């Protein structure tokens, strides 16, 4: 693992964006594996700035997202479809038909997971996969105990994860109880992985990730089996004040 420590969140976001931008410049038809949540927001903001100010084009890029809530329509403001459109897709020159996310409204969620995983395999996996990390080491919605060889699947969201995401919803009761997520094996099929952590609240998870012990009890530890992982953290996530 290559660990890069940045001074603060803004620098962290700029560094992550520069790595993704370099991937696109080297391979204009790159497959970008994307994540949602608070941590990547600054990355998308910087990529949009680079598109507008520096001419970075996403015209030939394909995107695949990690996950989506079950039961939410793409127009729902809490769906990850809506998040991606709001923070990124609506502001760049990419093609709408090249953005792929799991369909949380599918009649058969298990079949949808199989379809999505086959799509990712057909695309050859992500050229670069962006990840965040949960306090318990979850990546995507892969909670502790998820097999490392898992493929895209339906997951029951545990109480800790629902509480962590409750700030985006009017109440905890409205947080979905299920989601569709790339499995750990699917994530590991990416050619390069970029995992980000920001803030003191993520310091313990970062410490556990970097101590090198591999266990399904800490999903992010699976990344030690991947040959090209960059860990981007700010000073607070590194354990500093």
From Swiss-Prot:
BP-aspect Gene Ontology terms: carbohydrate metabolic process; glucosamine catabolic process; N-acetylglucosamine catabolic process; N-acetylneuraminate catabolic process
The protein's Enzyme Commission number: 3.5.99.6
InterPro entries: Glc/Gal-6P_isomerase, Glucosamine6P_isomerase, NagB/RpiA_transferase-like
Active site: 67, 136, 138, 143
Record bears the keyword RNA-binding: no
HAMAP family: GlcN6P_deamin
Protein name: Glucosamine-6-phosphate deaminase
Organism: Bacillus velezensis (strain DSM 23117 / BGSC 10A6 / LMG 26770 / FZB42)
Gene label: nagB
